[in-house]
């Protein structure tokens, strides 16, 4: 079809050029004839003038000029009708030629149109119409959200004439794997008439869609009878209804046709939209997960706050094992005391409590066990308060520890004054100020060997209890402010210095007492110790009631905090 149209266009252009050439030649010939006529008339006028000049040379100049002028006017009068007649003839001829040329052009165009129509008619008669004209293609593709695969069968009529080729698709279920390259591309054109789509559902849940696509200017055999008027309207330019139907059909094809034959197959917008929806759902899930995490993160500080409130009166998890180990080294009688003391300790002093729990050395375990049976209850209450008497505010801790420290130092000073005779003042100063624990233990054991029976048990309690008290007091003092420690040490050294000065003065006054003291040191030591211990037991029995009441109040407070 395109070749015939091109040849007709070329022929028409050649005819037009030929007509233009003819017109140009005619116009040139007319011009030449006009020039020839004008030249001939000019020559005749010149001859007449020459003749008149020769004949009337005798006359005067003025008369000659007048006659010559008259002759010229006559010649002009004779020439003008001839020239006017020639111009009129040429114009008439040219007008007739143009009219003929226009008529020829119209005739040629009519012939070309008739030839094109005859060629189209021949082509339509040569190709008999059939229902299977064009390519029949069926695709099965799973659509998300449907119960089963949807079968899409499409019927297209291709412009170029050729053999009918059918590509049967897989009718049973979706394809398990891509079968080679994709099929030939489908040429989908706009629909020329509204044809309702046929939706059929099989027993297996498959939906078959059979849209029919018809190209503009062509029709099927069955539809030709029904839609002749519609097709004529579409050929003339179409109506608003047909345009709306085309747009609707385009959208329907985009949403219905799905190509999933292979990895390289085409995908329509209908698949992309569910993917976007899936991405949106994933994003929503991520947002929900983030919100849950944020809620859990928000819940963590609340839990931490509750843990902090509880841990102010309890022990964190990290040091549970250490505290259990430290409790395992402590005898059974003191386990409950240690646990209660640890429950009342705030965070800042947990390490101090663990150190105070680990005070008991391996070598002194037996002594501590012995001391449990013989320690007076006053000293046990002091130990309990030194360990479990730590409250939230450090002021109460400082006050109680100062009271414990002062009581312990007073008891030690009293014992040292009762134990040490005048002859051993230098040794007592060393033992009280900077004597190591080993020497104290040796001295106390040597002193303990003097007495017998129940006095030996009391001495063993004294041997073990002062060590534990001293170590616990020292490590509990580490939690107290450094300024208070320095003040307490200064006070203890001042007291010791005053006692030493008094003893030196007594020694200077009575030098004979030194010798007596050297002889009777051993006996005096035992007697003084027994007296001091009895006095301390009496004082302890007096203060039992008050300290037991205080300990009971502290235990009740710790139980409330643990709850």
From Swiss-Prot:
Membrane-spanning residues: 3-23, 99-119
Biased segments, Basic and acidic residues type: 69-79, 367-383, 412-447, 485-544
Record's bilayer topology term: Multi-pass membrane protein
Listed Low complexity bias regions: 384-395
Keyword ATP-binding: no
InterPro entries documented for this protein: TSBP1 (IPR038754)
Gene Ontology CC entries for this record: membrane; nucleus
Localization in the cell: Membrane
Span list, region Disordered: 56-81, 311-563
Keywords attached to this entry: Membrane, Transmembrane, Transmembrane helix
Name the record gives this protein: Testis-expressed basic protein 1
């Amino acid at each position: 079809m395109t070749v015939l149209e091109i040849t007709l266009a070329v022929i028409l252009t050649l005819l037009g050029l030929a007509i233009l050439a003819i017109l140009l030649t005619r116009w040139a010939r007319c011009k030449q004839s006009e020039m020839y006529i004008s030249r001939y008339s000019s020559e005749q006028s010149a001859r007449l003038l020459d003749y008149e000049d020769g004949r009337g040379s005798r006359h005067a100049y003025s008369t000659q000029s007048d006659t010559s002028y008259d002759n010229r006017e006559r010649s002009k009068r004779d020439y003008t009708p001839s020239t006017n007649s020639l111009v009129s003839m040429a114009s008439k001829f040219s007008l007739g030629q143009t009219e003929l040329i226009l008529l020829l052009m119209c005739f040629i165009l009519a012939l070309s149109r008739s030839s094109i129509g005859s060629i189209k008619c021949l082509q339509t008669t040569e190709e008999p119409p059939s229902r299977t004209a064009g390519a029949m293609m069926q695709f099965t593709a799973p659509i998300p959200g449907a119960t089963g695969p949807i079968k899409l069968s499409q019927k297209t009529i291709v412009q170029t004439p050729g053999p009918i080729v059918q590509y049967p698709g897989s009718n049973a279920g979706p394809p398990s794997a891509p079968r080679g390259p994709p099929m030939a591309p489908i040429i989908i054109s706009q629909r020329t008439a509204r044809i309702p789509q046929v939706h059929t559902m099989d027993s297996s849940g498959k939906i078959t869609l059979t849209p029919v696509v018809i190209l503009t200017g062509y029709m099927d055999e069955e539809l030709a009878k029904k839609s002749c008027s519609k097709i004529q309207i579409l050929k003339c330019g179409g109506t608003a209804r047909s345009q709306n139907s085309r747009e609707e059909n385009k959208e329907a094809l985009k949403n219905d046709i799905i190509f999933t034959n292979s990895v390289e197959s085409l995908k329509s917008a209908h698949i992309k939209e569910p993917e976007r929806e899936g991405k949106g759902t994933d994003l929503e899930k991520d947002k929900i997960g983030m919100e849950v995490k944020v809620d859990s993160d928000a819940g963590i500080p609340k839990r931490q706050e509750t843990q902090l409130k509880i841990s102010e009166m309890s022990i964190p998890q990290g040091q549970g094992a250490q505290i259990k180990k430290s409790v395992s080294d402590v005898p059974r009688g003191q386990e409950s005391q240690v646990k209660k003391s640890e429950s009342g300790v705030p965070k800042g002093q947990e390490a101090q409590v663990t150190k105070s729990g680990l005070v008991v050395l391996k070598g002194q375990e037996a002594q501590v066990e012995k001391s449990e049976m013989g320690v007076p209850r006053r000293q046990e209450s002091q130990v309990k308060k030194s360990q479990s008497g730590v409250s939230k505010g450090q002021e109460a801790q400082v006050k109680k520890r100062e009271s414990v420290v002062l009581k312990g130092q007073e008891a030690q000073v009293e014992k040292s004054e009762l134990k040490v005779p005048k002859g051993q003042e230098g040794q007592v100063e060393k033992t009280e100020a900077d004597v190591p624990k080993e020497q104290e233990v040796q001295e106390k054991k040597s002193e303990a060997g003097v007495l017998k029976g129940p006095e030996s048990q009391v001495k063993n309690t004294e041997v073990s209890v002062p060590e534990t008290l001293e170590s616990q007091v020292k490590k509990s003092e580490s939690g107290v402010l450094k300024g208070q420690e320095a003040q307490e040490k200064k006070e203890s050294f001042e007291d010791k210095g005053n006692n030493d000065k008094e003893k030196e003065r007594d020694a200077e006054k009575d030098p004979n007492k030194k010798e007596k003291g050297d002889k009777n040191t051993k006996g005096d030591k035992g007697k003084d110790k027994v007296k001091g211990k009895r006095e301390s037991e009496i004082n302890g029995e007096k203060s039992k009631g008050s300290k037991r009441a205080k300990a009971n109040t502290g235990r009740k407070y710790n139980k409330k905090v643990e709850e």
